[in-house]
C-alpha cells in the first residue's frame, strides 16, 4: 500500500511539472504565469552570466600566477610592443579559440597556463652598469617558465636601420664574460654578412638556442650580450637603444617551448541561444570583452567566446543524464541534487604582458565551455 502511495505521489508530481495547475482550479497555466516563468529564467541566466564573467577574471589572474592585473597603460604598451615579424604573425594569424566538438575535457586540463612562446625585452644588469665604455646592449632576464620546459627555438631579433644605397652590413653578436687576465670581456656568438638595399630598415633574426640553454644551465654566466652592425663606411645600423620615432624597434628574444599534449575524452550536451525557452541544462553563448575590463595588458585576443551553463536538472529530465540519475538515486541524501555545470572545456591561446613587462604567448586551460551537463 505504501509503495502504491509513493508511485501515485511521483505520478502527480510529474504531472504538476509538465502541466502546472493554476490556483483558480483551471488546468492551463495563466498568461501571467508563463510571463513570470520566462522572466525568472531570463533573470537567472543574467545572474549566471555575470557570475561567469567575474569567475573568468579571477581564473585568468590565478592561472597566469598574477596576484593582480599588470598595471600597464596603452602608451607604455605602444612603446614596448615590438613591431617585429614573429609578434605580428601571432596577432594577425591569431587563433582565438575553436568552438567545435574536438576532444578535450575539464578533468584532463591542468590548472595553470601552458607557456608556448615568450618574448623577452632587454633590461640593464648591474654588470653592464659597472663596465667602462657602456656596451651596445643587452641583458635578458628569463622567466622561470622557460627553465621548466623544453626549449625548441630561441632567436635574437635585431632591427637594422635603412641604408641609402646598396651596401654590405657586418653583424656581430658577442657574449659578455667576466674579465680575463688579458682583459678580454667578450666571446663570439655569431657573425654574419648581409646585403641590404635602399628602402626601409629590416628585422634580422639570429639563432641563439645553444647560448640560451647554457645560460639556463648556468645562470651566473648570463652577463649580457653586445650587438654590432656596421656598414662599409662604419655607420652603426643596429637599433639597440631606440631614438625618436623608433618605438617598438628594441632588440628582443623570441623563445619557444613545447609541452606534452594530454589525452582527452568526448562529451555531448544541449546548445541554446539567448532567446531559447529550453528549461533543461544547456550551454549559452557568452562573449568576454577584455577591453571592457580595462585589461590593456592582454594583447590578444581582445575578446573571446567563453559560454556558460544554465538550466534545470529536475527528475523528469534526468533520463538525458542516466549516470548522474543512478548515482543520485543510490544515495539521495548524499547531495542537494545534480547541478548544471560544464562537463567539457577547452583552452584559449593568449598573448599578454606579465608583471615583468615580458610578452608571453601561452595556452590557458579550461576557459571555454564546450559542453554542459548535470552532475
Curated annotation (Swiss-Prot):
Entry's Gene Ontology cellular component terms: extracellular space
Propeptide regions on this chain: 24-266
Record keywords, A-Z: Cleavage on pair of basic residues, Cytokine, Disulfide bond, Glycoprotein, Growth factor, Secreted, Signal
S-S pairs: 272-282, 281-340, 309-372, 313-374
Localization (cell): Secreted
Entries under Pfam families matching the protein: TGF_beta, TGFb_propeptide
GO BP term, example: muscle cell proliferation
Family: Belongs to the TGF-beta family.
Subunit structure: Homodimer; disulfide-linked.
Functional note: Acts specifically as a negative regulator of skeletal muscle growth.
Protein name per Swiss-Prot or TrEMBL: Growth/differentiation factor 8
Organism phylogeny: Eukaryota, Metazoa, Chordata, Craniata, Vertebrata
Name of the gene encoding the protein in the UniProt record: MSTN
